[in-house]
From Swiss-Prot:
Domain ATP-grasp, chain residue ranges per copy: 134-340
Listed Gene3D superfamilies: 3.40.50.20, ATP-grasp fold, A domain, ATP-grasp fold, B domain
Binding site for Mg(2+) 2: 296, 298
GO BP annotations listed: cell wall organization; peptidoglycan biosynthetic process; regulation of cell shape
Source lineage: Bacteria, Pseudomonadati, Campylobacterota, Epsilonproteobacteria, Campylobacterales
EC number per UniProt: 6.3.2.4
Residues binding ATP: 161-212
Spans traversing the lipid bilayer: none
Descriptive protein name: D-alanine--D-alanine ligase
One GO CC term on file: cytoplasm
Length: 346
């Protein structure tokens, strides 16, 4: 199978996307990979799979590659004798953050009739914005961590007790995130967060909370990852998350009861189906007093959370054959013809 990897984008997580994309070479070994890079100024470049490495992008060498245009049914190179389509079977969206997770890529792929693995438009909107994720969870009967919402031009007062954690609403990878232990630290933390976003959510910082990650998709049958208990530190900053996104070897399953595992997976399915059909997502959960709370939805997890699956590549192949399809609309202009006919008789 030929899989196009779309990565980069005009995003604060641009570099993490590059790391995720390079990692796919180690993971999708049986597939033919076609790399399509989106520069910070949103131009498309075809990248030589054999030559892809991080320096290619930091040095600007990627600009020597073929520039692509997006048209109906795919990406095309431009030449003296016309355009040539870039061949692939399915596109894997690996743009983290803005462009990739906010619905822009989903909209383009749908509009230009390109098969793709990624959340669709509505799912992107609900999972990219942490505030909307809270609303989604509430509508599904899934409990979340308590929160308050602050806007850049609004009041900076919070009512919950310290310590708290400040998160930009539309960012991942711990960018702009701070733990605030007292009121004296609040203004600075908000200044940092508002550098990246106009809205933040404030949540209680729960010291020593049990955290579990569950990834999966639906390919006609449920394909769920192991339940992972990630490394426990007070806070995983951007650097640690950056390294985390390059993982390519499977991790061990969390040592938890079968009942807790089943409850986490039932909650995951409730979130995934039907909104996230056609995508591989990861949900991060907290367990507090035996209660499962949704922390975040990762619509395009780092390196696609490949390390949580025993057969990630096989799953990608199966998912590519089970993607949701838009209904074709037949337009025959009957209404306009009837108006024209009526006018002709008048």
């Amino acid at each position: 199978m030929n899989i196009a990897i779309l990565f980069g984008g005009s995003s604060f997580e641009h570099e993490i996307s590059i790391v995720s994309a390079i990692t796919m070479k180690k993971v999708l070994k049986k597939s033919t990979l076609t790399y399509i890079f989106v520069s910070a100024d949103r131009k498309f470049y075809l990248i030589d799979t054999e030559k892809i490495n991080s320096k290619l992008f930091s040095s600007g060498e990627y600009k020597k590659g073929k520039q692509l245009v997006l048209k109906n049914d795919g990406f095309f190179t431009k030449g003296m004798f016309g355009s040539k389509q870039v061949a692939f079977d399915v596109l894997l969206n690996l743009i983290h953050g803005r462009d990739g997770e906010d619905g822009k890529v989903a909209s383009m792929m749908e509009f230009f009739n390109i098969p793709y693995i990624s959340p669709r438009l509505e799912a992107s909107a609900m999972s990219y914005n942490k505030l909307y994720t809270k609303f989604l969870a509430e509508s599904l009967g899934v409990k979340t961590v308590p929160y308050e919402h602050l806007s850049k031009n609004g009041d900076r007062k919070i009512s919950m007790e310290y310590p708290v954690i400040i998160k930009p609403v539309r960012l991942g990878s711990s960018i702009g995130v701070s733990i605030v232990k007292s009121e004296a630290e609040l203004d600075y933390a908000l200044d940092v967060a508002f550098e990246f976003d106009n809205d933040v959510i404030v949540e209680p910082f729960i010291d020593g909370v049990k955290e579990f990650n569950q990834a999966g998709c639906h390919t006609g049958d449920w394909e769920l990852s192991i339940v992972e208990e990630p490394q426990k530190e007070e806070f995983l900053d951007f650097e640690k998350k950056y390294m985390d996104f390059s993982r390519d070897s499977q991790v061990l399953s969390a040592d938890i009861s079968e009942e807790l595992k089943n409850n986490i997976q039932v909650t995951f399915k409730k979130i995934y189906d039907p909104l996230f059909m056609g995508s591989i997502i990861r949900c991060d959960f907290f367990v507090v007093n035996d209660e499962i709370l949704l922390n975040e939805i990762n619509p395009i997890p780092g390196s696609m959370a490949n390390y949580l699956f025993p057969d990630f590549e096989g799953m990608v192949w199966r998912l590519s054959k089970a993607l949701p399809k838009e209904k074709n609309i037949s337009i025959d202009y009957t209404y306009i013809h009837s108006i024209q006919s009526a006018k002709g008789k008048a």
